[in-house]
């Protein structure tokens, strides 16, 4: 025989749950993207109440006051609230109406901060695993980009500046060189007066020799 579980003993992640409960409320129908209809119902036994998610036609058949036996159900946290589901091969069977002792409190489907803290570390770990990679990816390109920009754009402009600077410096250097070339003729008469006197003396000698 299957052992029955009380609402107070339901924990997230439990499977193959067998319960007997009474339906207190039936919620609104919501449709999924696949076209399925989902209804959340509030059920209870003598230990407390909990929400159960029922799909499609079964949800339309359930009415408040029905006493139902759940077989092969499972529990999970949905939006921070503990919720019952019918698993694969699970079944909901109506076994009676109204005559059942139940307690609406405590409501185990109320938001529980413990469930949020259990889910938060997992999300934070995933964020931490992704965050280092993201900053590395962001810091890498910008670090390389400014360097490349400085080398390609600003670097070239700064290099062009000094390169342009030396050209004017070279241009004045060229005029002095031209002045030097001009000064060479000046220097040549001043420098070679000795040799010039020699040709003059040689010329006189030649003239004297010619006169002789």
UniProtKB/Swiss-Prot annotation:
One GO biological process term: DNA damage response
CDD domains per record: SoSSB_OBF
Main location: nucleus
One Pfam family in the UniProt entry: Ssb-like_OB
Regions recorded as binding DNA: 22-92
Low complexity compositional bias, start-end: 131-148, 166-178
Listed InterPro entries: NA-bd_OB-fold, SOSS-B, Ssb-like_OB
Tree of life domain: Eukaryota
Modification sites for Phosphothreonine: 117
GO CC list: chromosome, telomeric region; cytosol; nucleoplasm; nucleus; site of double-strand break; SOSS complex
Keywords: DNA damage, DNA repair, DNA-binding, Nucleus, Phosphoprotein, Ubl conjugation
Record region (Disordered): 110-212
Processing and modification events after translation: Phosphorylated by ATM in response to DNA damage. Phosphorylation prevents degradation by the proteasome, hence stabilization of the protein and accumulation within cells. Ubiquitinated in a FBXL5-dependent manner, leading to proteasomal degradation.
Entry's localization field: Nucleus
NADP recorded as keyword: no
Residue spans of biased composition, Polar residues class: 114-130, 149-160
Sample GO molecular function, one term: single-stranded DNA binding
Record's subunit section: Component of the SOSS complex, composed of SOSS-B (SOSS-B1/NABP2 or SOSS-B2/NABP1), SOSS-A/INTS3 and SOSS-C/INIP. SOSS complexes containing SOSS-B1/NABP2 are more abundant than complexes containing SOSS-B2/NABP1. Directly interacts with ATM, SOSS-A/INTS3 and RAD51. Interacts with INTS7.
Family per similarity comment: Belongs to the SOSS-B family. SOSS-B1 subfamily.
Protein's job: Component of the SOSS complex, a multiprotein complex that functions downstream of the MRN complex to promote DNA repair and G2/M checkpoint. In the SOSS complex, acts as a sensor of single-stranded DNA that binds to single-stranded DNA, in particular to polypyrimidines. The SOSS complex associates with DNA lesions and influences diverse endpoints in the cellular DNA damage response including cell-cycle checkpoint activation, recombinational repair and maintenance of genomic stability.
Protein name in UniProt: SOSS complex subunit B1
Source organism of this protein record: Mus musculus (Mouse)
